[in-house]
């Protein structure tokens, strides 16, 4: 009974957070460049359109490593889980937080379709900082870093933005330019291999 009440509480939180659009610069899924979507999925979540919001094998691996090998609770986050974490949860790394993240991801995918979730992620993911203003979403990041529209980005520029998803501070374009360059090259390499297979 308590668990059902808790699930209802989480469902209400999700509805309140995702049932309306808060960004004036948000693009529809159809407006997002397909190359960028493919690049993002290849690097961040290759099974996005197959899993129910949670990659159970990865979750089990991370929990096992945490319990038996004292490793930090890192990885195993699908795009859906990342969206939950970025929108509703704090940066705390605990087993309880990971379980809550997974539960909310399952509920979110039950309530909204995959394209909605992916598009919300693309429009809101944190990609940098300008003073006190955070740069959220690929549209805003494109304007900030390249002063152009998202549709006009080159593959190299898309790869840079996708590289930043992993950590805009760690891969800061000015302070850690070499680190970002290596990450960008990895993103491009993964994408180009995919393109060869498709062709």
What positions do the PLM features span?
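Juxtamembrane regions of bacterial inner-membrane/periplasmic proteins
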Residues: 1-199
């Amino acid at each position: 009974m308590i668990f059902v009440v808790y699930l209802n509480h989480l469902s209400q939180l999700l509805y309140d957070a995702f049932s309306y659009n808060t960004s004036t610069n948000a693009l529809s899924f159809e407006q997002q460049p397909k190359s960028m979507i493919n690049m993002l999925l290849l690097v961040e979540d290759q099974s996005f359109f197959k899993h129910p919001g949670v990659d159970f094998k990865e979750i089990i691996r991370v929990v096992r490593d945490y319990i038996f090998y004292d490793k930090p609770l890192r990885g195993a986050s699908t795009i859906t889980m990342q969206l939950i974490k970025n929108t509703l949860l704090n940066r705390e790394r605990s087993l309880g937080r990971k379980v809550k993240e997974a539960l909310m991801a399952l509920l979110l995918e039950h309530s909204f379709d995959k394209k909605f979730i992916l598009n919300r992620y693309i429009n809101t993911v944190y990609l940098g900082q300008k003073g006190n203003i955070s740069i959220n979403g690929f549209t805003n990041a494109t304007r900030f870093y390249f002063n152009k529209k998202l549709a006009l980005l080159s593959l190299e520029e898309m790869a840079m933005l996708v590289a930043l998803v992993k950590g805009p501070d760690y891969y800061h374009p000015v302070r850690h330019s070499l680190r970002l360059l290596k990450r960008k090259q990895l993103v491009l390499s993964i994408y180009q291999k995919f393109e060869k297979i498709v062709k």
